[in-house]
């Protein structure tokens, strides 16, 4: 297993002789190095400009923020060892800070400068709580952040992935795997936190893992074990997020969702943030504005406390990578609540808004004040633009098969398996992406035999979720489990079926066909591996 994981990363970055090792995101030249996502240049790493739209300056500031977070991790771990409590606001900063560096989240230099300054203050605060530290603090803990942005950019080369040319490649790969897993888990922890849910166990692991990423004494085996530990921590984190979502908005139930346009003003909501959607629905009720989900917000239609709003009209478009085409000259407003944002085209830059950790230079941002967001600018823009002029012929798809809904069919599923009506289960899902060849997932789904069931989740579902797969008895052949974090639901379903058949998960007639794009997929992969789940393709 270890060799496969190392190969996963080693094959995705440029070898030492192929890039300028001394320059990583500094301000004096057009250079960077980032290999955290699937679409990196030539499959090795972005060295001039990010395929995602990230420029070298933003890349450098992100690297430096991760560097600062490693320093915070060092002092945080020391405090935890001494049973000294770390305040919730610092836990939140750590998860939000690491989340902000995830692919397609934030591209705003000034926001990163603010985060860096806050990180430096927190690092000093934590250091000040340790009376004596008879230990060798890493450079990340001792580093002092300069005041101005240009100096930060000059310093950022020390934070670059490839800065230490002598570092063992396997150690580098496992460190980066750990950091990318944290970025994904940071997203899930953030979404749970804004709903009032968190786990001290998960929060403590952020400090432990960040400190480990700066610890030069750790071996390949040490780092491998930490990656598996991260997988377990992320499973707990996804469990907390599932609880947050279901206790706040109810258990998802099978629901038909309109995927065609309705006449009138509208707002498209993209990302993953259920709380933002709830607040927007409250603020638009009775105003004649339709609300459409986009991308990973599609599963929101299945939550009782969200779908009770009649103006939650439907789902618009497909996965994240099509947004520049789908939002082009759109006669409505767009709200980006989390990743994935792409560079807005001029044709809709005046009507797209960001919130939470999302940022793009010169794009309107909706601030949160005392836990509330005022979406008046978004609402006014939607009314000003007027919306679509006529209805389209209706088409609907089915969502809402989280673990609670799917397991309500457990007896029927078990009987169908025993009677030979269901021969196999395929989980086809994960992050979608723009690279050619992803029609593989469409073709795979189409070729699955009619006596098999397809479970799907995350935005990879858009490759086939508008196709008709029919039914097996009373059960649809295609079951939409939810967002990427609902991998937790998929695991719960698999574990429940394994219990029912008195076998292990790997003995089930189950195959996982996964796609990846960014770091949430990395932490989910680590979770699956840490649970010992096999048959992953």
Task: Show the residue positions of the predicted features.
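Anaerobic metallocofactor- and corrinoid-dependent redox/one-carbon enzyme cores
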Residues: 22-41, 46, 54-58, 62, ...
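Short, Lys/Arg-enriched N-terminal segments with co-localized hydrophobic residues
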Residues: 4-20
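Long, compositionally biased, glycine/small-hydrophobic-enriched stretches that function as flexible linkers
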Residues: 22-251, 255-264, 268, 288, ...
